[in-house]
């Protein structure tokens, strides 16, 4: 079975975006890129690599993003303490997406029927962030 090991996020501010993921989730910087095609950072939690890139080459960017965009919708992070993560997210200007969380009956604990609930936040560059203490279906709860 294939395993997810890499996610790339396009941004106009790679330093700011990388700082967000390092400060809030403790990801480590494992590399940098600066070329004619892109500049940015590679971050990791030891299991997955997240590329934070500002593309300089229109060919590499691919299709222009618009309302029909299909791509990364959100990234989920399993955290040890959802309340502590909430504090860090708010300090980094990432706030809960109240309408979505309300619709999903999301809160700081498990949802209806004991099922896991992820809290959604507005992350940098329009990428929605999920946090969960219990993980997701198909992942092991720590």
Q: What are these regions, as identified by a protein language model?
A:
Residues 1-16, 72-79, 132-142:
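N-terminal beta-strand motif that seeds the catalytic metal site of vicinal oxygen chelate
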Residues 3, 37, 71, 115:
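Exposed loop/turn and edge beta-strand positions of beta-sandwich/beta-sheet ligand-binding modules
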Residues 10-50, 54-55:
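Core segments of cupin and vicinal oxygen chelate
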Residues 17-20, 85-89:
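Hydrophobic side chains in well-ordered alpha-helices
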Residues 45-47, 69-72:
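Short connector loops at helix/strand junctions that flank enzyme active sites
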Residues 58-62, 137-140:
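A short local loop/turn or secondary-structure capping micro-motif enriched for an aromatic residue
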Residues 86-142:
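Vicinal oxygen chelate
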